[in-house]
């Protein structure tokens, strides 16, 4: 998880000690909520890539699944126009992943096709989506941001229909 500190980092919320304690660690670093990986490192520099948000992680039987990792791969599938992975409640595993896909017009995707594609990209079996919902479009706000809470409701209705 990315933590930052410096002159350009804000010093906290005005009159909100409780929230400030939650977003700053004991050394004064701001906890961003972003997950990252080091993509290149040498003696002088490090290069990082943000790979998602902590709050978006899917926890299946204690194993962590990054939706962004799977979305990045599935977005390269020729039959996928748009994709989002969200957690889905499960009585055995706690959460499982559900792939919400807008297929390219005229294309038909199945969970088997999706998971075969992910396996070709060396994705571990515990990360594979266990549900697939195909949609005409992903719910977005006026500026194009994915509405994940709305998407969870759509998925709940689709799966329980």
What does each model-found stretch correspond to?
Residues 6, 11-12, 21, 35-127, ...:
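AMP-binding/adenylate-forming catalytic core of the ANL superfamily
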Residues 1-4:
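A structural motif
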Residues 154-161:
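Acidic/polar alpha-helix N-cap and adjacent early helical turns
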């Amino acid at each position: 998880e990315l933590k930052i500190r410096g002159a350009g980092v804000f010093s906290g919320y005005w009159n909100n000690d409780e929230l400030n304690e939650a977003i700053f660690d004991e050394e004064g670093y701001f906890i961003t909520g972003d997950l990252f990986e080091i993509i290149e490192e040498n003696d002088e520099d490090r290069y990082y890539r943000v790979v998602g948000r902590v709050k978006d992680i899917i926890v299946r039987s204690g194993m962590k699944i990054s939706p962004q990792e799977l979305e990045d791969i599935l977005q390269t599938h020729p039959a996928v126009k748009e994709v989002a992975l969200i957690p889905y409640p499960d009585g055995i595993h706690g959460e499982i992943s559900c792939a919400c896909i807008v297929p390219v017009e005229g294309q038909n995707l199945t969970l088997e096709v999706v998971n075969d594609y992910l396996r070709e990209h060396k994705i571990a079996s515990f990360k594979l989506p266990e549900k697939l919902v195909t949609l005409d479009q992903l719910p977005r706000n006026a500026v194009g941001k994915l509405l994940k809470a709305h998407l969870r409701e759509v998925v709940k209705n689709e799966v329980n229909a």
